[in-house]
Amino acid sequence: VNHTIFIIGTRPEITKIAPIANNLNSKILFTGQHFSKNMSNGFFDLIKNREIINLNLKRFKNFDNNIRFIANQLEIKLKKLNANKIIVQGDTNTTLVGAIATKTLNKKLYFIESGMRSFDISQIEEYNRLITSHLADINFCNHITNKENLLNEGVSKSKILVTGSTVYSAVNLVDSSIESIGEKKYILLTLHRPENVDKKEKLLNLLKTINKLNYRVIFPVHPRTKANLDKYDIQKLENIKFLKPKNYKDFIELIKYSKFIISDSGGVQEEAAIYRKPLLIPRQYTERPEMLNKFNILVKNNKELLMQSKNILNGNSCLEKPLLVTPLLYGKMKPIENIINGINNK
């Protein structure tokens, strides 16, 4: 039997492919790039009745420097599985490795969430996106701006499909089981990008700035960030509550009932928008510029972060009005149907 295989390796990839995998005869190949138990365990519950093959490649401590080797491991597995259609998602190292393995075997590659560009090539995610979209046979885009990016880079129109985003469907998988508790008085914080967490000074100043708001902050800590907090001996700050990573339902609940969110994550931009929560992005660039100043604000330094946070807390943020009236950008297009039709028919 020829199989359709998803290659994934991180929590956001699990959540974003779950609604598709649940409606498509497929298997899941998990590289284990997110390697701590509580990083992936509660997330696999989102996938129903599909075989999940865990390659457990976490034992290669330095995943990033073993791309060729890991691609080779994937090739061996894909051959055994007789896979003919392979799907990757997002912008992680697993995305790139999956794409390389697929094309080495000359199999058909489908790329979900293609065409996003921050135009900041110093970020590993940007070149993962760039290379994967040029290797893909079919690029599924969340938004028309993503399609335009690909056309500008010379990707053939016949290889591009604007489908909408699966995040809306992923949130729907858990929303109904979230208890109704109403908005709580806390800011939700997530940080994982190297530019924010890999340098002691940067990480410490960012946390100190957020602590200065004198407002309760809930901070589920990503393993990469946790390792650096330990390494730099950054102790708890009085207003910031450090938590272990949450499963998807609990994390979405934290978004739903937060006052506002500070996050450098791409997926959180979409999740926050669904609940119309103001979001501040502590980064220099974003790969979702179409959301800026409607659903979120890019804060390029700590001074801006402090100012915009105070504006939200004082009820005079420039996001107040747009958040009420802007239609959701990616969710209403039936992305699951569009992507499944694309996989079956192209």
Residue positions per predicted region:
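Nucleotide-activated sugar donor-binding and catalytic core shared by glycosyltransferases
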Residues: 1-215, 225-346
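Short loop-to-beta-strand entry elements in the cores of soluble alpha/beta enzymes
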Residues: 217-219
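Conserved C-terminal portion of the radical SAM core fold
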Residues: 222
